[in-house]
């Protein structure tokens, strides 16, 4: 990775990430006070090693100062002294600042690990960060950040998809890290904004945990990104936002597909579905991770309600 700020597992072998998603701040800020208070409280209670913003940090359409707005969101992590990484959502660059310029807002920020990514592939903000071992200079895990775009061409409609050149880039990065790890895939996570179509599949075909109060708003085109993740064998879990009142997760072909918990108050939500954040904890040397929710009222949700596909029942074994 090109960044000189190296992430590392703690001496106890853990690494904790807080995922904030769909903050939807704007530069007037009036409706974001409870959002920022929530974020500050989560960081104070969880003391993570990294904050990841999985898109729609701002509602940029009509905002005269979108760069200021997006900086105000990530400043919450800066004030807490915690490094952060960003992927853009479909609402972050709908106004006067284009996507390429918006991701570069974080260049030179001492707390930002965000990268614009290769100029010769689709999207802005495709990059990978490695976590060094607690007592080693070798990578112990990897975090992939992928730009899922915004909107599909009008003749297709709906949302954008992760492009083939981005998938090829991921495969190249994964291959290199696997070779560096003695031929064994490096335990990894992937973060992007718009869920891939397999989020619908896992809900309909497997036992999931958590809520689905709206349809999965994935692209109409399945470009094969999830297939590549399965084939490479390194990514253990994916984390998205986009659908504000979904927070479920389920495992499909060995990969846990996870929604975050929508964080922002300046956007749609649901009565009785508090804003919050998803917490992710890696353990050095293990191909596994723990995850839980921390909600606005301080509740920590370790076990989410199970959902079974139609016609299935829980085993009593």
Tell me what each language-model feature is.
Residues 1-78:
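N-terminal active-site segment of His-dependent metallophosphoesterases
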Residues 2-9, 69-183, 278-283:
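Extended active-site neighborhood of metal-dependent phosphoesterases/phosphodiesterases
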Residues 4-6, 11, 128-133, 137, ...:
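Binuclear metal-dependent phosphoesterase catalytic core
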Residues 14-27, 140-150, 191, 255-262:
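Active-site-proximal beta-strand elements of phosphoester/diester hydrolases
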Residues 21-36, 58-68, 94, 153-161, ...:
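Acidic/histidine-rich helix-loop elements
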Residues 22, 39, 51, 56, ...:
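Divalent metal-coordination and catalytic microenvironments
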Residues 26-28, 59-62, 86-98, 151-154, ...:
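Active-site environment of divalent metal-dependent phosphoester hydrolases
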Residues 47-50, 142-144, 156-247, 315-316:
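His/acidic metal-ligating clusters that form di-metal
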